[in-house]
């Protein structure tokens, strides 16, 4: 059954399976996944068993979806201790997806005895044994089995721990993802020191100087934001001096937009730095910056091969 049209149950899927073309040889058995309607139009909740854990994710399909065309997918990852539904509500991606014709996936992080709902990114989550890279990879394969997704245009975005996870994904699953965006996230030492992307990677970081949860200057559990930006600027062989744009926010604060250009495959690395923003997802009304719009406008420029001409 098509995930964009109706709810999917195990009984209707028989024993359909798919082998992961990226080499993990992971069998995807649709009969182990049950997708059901929610109280929101075109939003399904999909439950599955992964690594002996009960996991789930939400998937939103735009109203104008053309089932004959491949469609991009944006993963939206919540922060530590939060939930997929909470993230869904404050990111408000639905109207953007409707206008631009892409699918949004909201996975739910796992909870363990020592950690609240989280994404396993090493570092400060090192007590976790949850296989989140494989979980995201499995979701991609499950989507592929149900709908014609554009596998060259898979993107990840996230808030805080979800931003860390977006970086973790492109360091460990770069054959899947074309671009990412992090809001108030960073990279753990483990992610930073063991990062091996297979292609130039567009990266957007949105951060506030008043964020003391994930400080701009870094701490024992996080790289500083300048270190993160420098990593990707150097990895992508970008011009070292950014093209800088300064805008006034609603409170007449100066918001800095640094775009590093002339990178391999014509990708960019971008930092949006707000002097008054704390650990939050900025909106146009409150901070003069819409993270959700900035994210889609940035990532949608790229596929796995770089800038889309």
Regions picked out by a protein language model, each given a short descriptive name:
Residues 47-155, 164-168, 172, 194, ...:
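Serine-hydrolase catalytic machinery in alpha/beta-hydrolase-like enzymes
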């Amino acid at each position: 059954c098509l995930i964009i049209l109706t709810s999917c149950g195990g009984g209707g899927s028989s024993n359909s399976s798919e082998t992961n073309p990226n080499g993990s040889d992971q069998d995807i058995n649709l009969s182990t996944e049950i997708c059901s309607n929610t109280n929101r139009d075109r939003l399904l909740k999909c439950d599955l068993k992964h690594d002996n854990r009960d996991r789930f994710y939400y998937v939103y399909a735009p109203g104008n979806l053309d089932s004959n065309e491949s469609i991009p997918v944006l993963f939206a990852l919540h922060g530590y201790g939060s939930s997929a539904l909470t993230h869904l509500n404050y990111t408000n991606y639905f109207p953007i997806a409707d206008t631009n014709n892409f699918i949004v996936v909201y996975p739910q992080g796992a909870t363990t005895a020592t950690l609240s709902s989280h994404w396993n990114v090493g570092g400060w989550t090192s007590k976790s044994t949850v296989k989140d890279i494989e979980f995201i990879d499995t979701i991609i394969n499950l989507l592929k089995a149900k709908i014609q997704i554009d596998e060259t245009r898979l993107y990840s975005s996230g808030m805080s721990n979800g931003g860390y996870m977006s970086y973790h994904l492109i360091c460990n699953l770069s054959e899947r993802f074309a671009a990412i965006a992090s809001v108030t996230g960073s990279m753990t030492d483990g992610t930073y020191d063991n990062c091996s992307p297979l292609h130039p990677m567009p990266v957007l970081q949105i951060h506030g100087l008043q964020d003391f949860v994930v400080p701009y200057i870094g701490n024992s559990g996080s790289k500083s934001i300048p270190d993160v930006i420098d990593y990707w600027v150097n990895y992508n062989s970008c011009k070292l001096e950014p093209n800088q744009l300064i805008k006034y926010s609603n409170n007449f604060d100066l918001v800095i937009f640094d775009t590093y250009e002339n990178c391999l495959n014509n990708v960019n690395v971008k930092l949006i730095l707000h002097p008054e923003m704390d650990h939050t997802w900025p909106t146009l009304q409150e901070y003069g910056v819409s993270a959700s719009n900035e994210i889609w406008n940035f990532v949608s420029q790229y596929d796995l091969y770089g800038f889309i001409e």
